[in-house]
């Protein structure tokens, strides 16, 4: 059993209705803490009722309530639909219209699940907020530090890089040292019906993976056709709207050529999709913005050798970073990397520790 090392406390658990957060609630309850379950309804209930593997709506709210009832803990469902739409869905749509590849789960963790939920937990008089994320918080010489989960297959640190130092002090991640199988065994031990429940999908508000329908619903007539141009400057055809393309895409381009072509750049201002050979995807350096830094301050003109991840599914790559003003950094790979997509996150590591991260901009070379 994982013990948080805290004295008996009042702890709010963010309960999504899945096995992870349910196991956290049961674990903390058994340890004698005063546990309060909170579930956020984040998007249209009607959309979610018939959707498998969603989260934060429909069946999942019911499952969270059933777990809370079994444990005998108070449980509240909070309507966060308007906050979620404003902070996450609208940003998701606007990012695609700007030719970016958005990362809504990070936006949700930053604005809704942490910022707003921590505020609610404090208002309830809670000492801490616990979640089912697979990351670790370790107390260092200068306060709380964020580390990867011990199970590489479930590590979620990439999605939590925007967590602030102040938030880290308040948060608890009881599952950071466990594997998914160990979590399911814990849930079975506690007799929770969700022990074998499948994991939710990444983008909870996109039915059947059709993000274009979400964009067209919120921004009608957003799929304006335009030119597809080769990186060497000649026109190859027409596209059906930049929302249908992402950096590194090969399939579905609808053009014939004598070698495989990939999307290498999207220009929202002139509504142009640029394509080229695989070699054109190589990127040596780029700029990140809105940097959240969790380690010791980097001095101006100081260069730091680190590992970075530019996609959640990619392994870390060696790079050199340097500070550019208050909220920007330059990232330079030791070896060129393919398909660096504006709108995605670049998360910076020193071993298993998360040093910080930021959002990839169009300043790519």
Curated annotation (Swiss-Prot):
Taxonomic superkingdom: Bacteria
Active site: 108, 204
Protein name as catalogued: tRNA-specific 2-thiouridylase MnmA
Site (Interaction with tRNA): 133, 344
First-listed, main subcellular location of the protein, grouped into a coarse class: cytoplasm
EC number: 2.8.1.13
Region of interest: Interaction with tRNA: 154-156
Catalytic activity: S-sulfanyl-L-cysteinyl-[protein] + uridine(34) in tRNA + AH2 + ATP = 2-thiouridine(34) in tRNA + L-cysteinyl-[protein] + A + AMP + diphosphate + H(+)
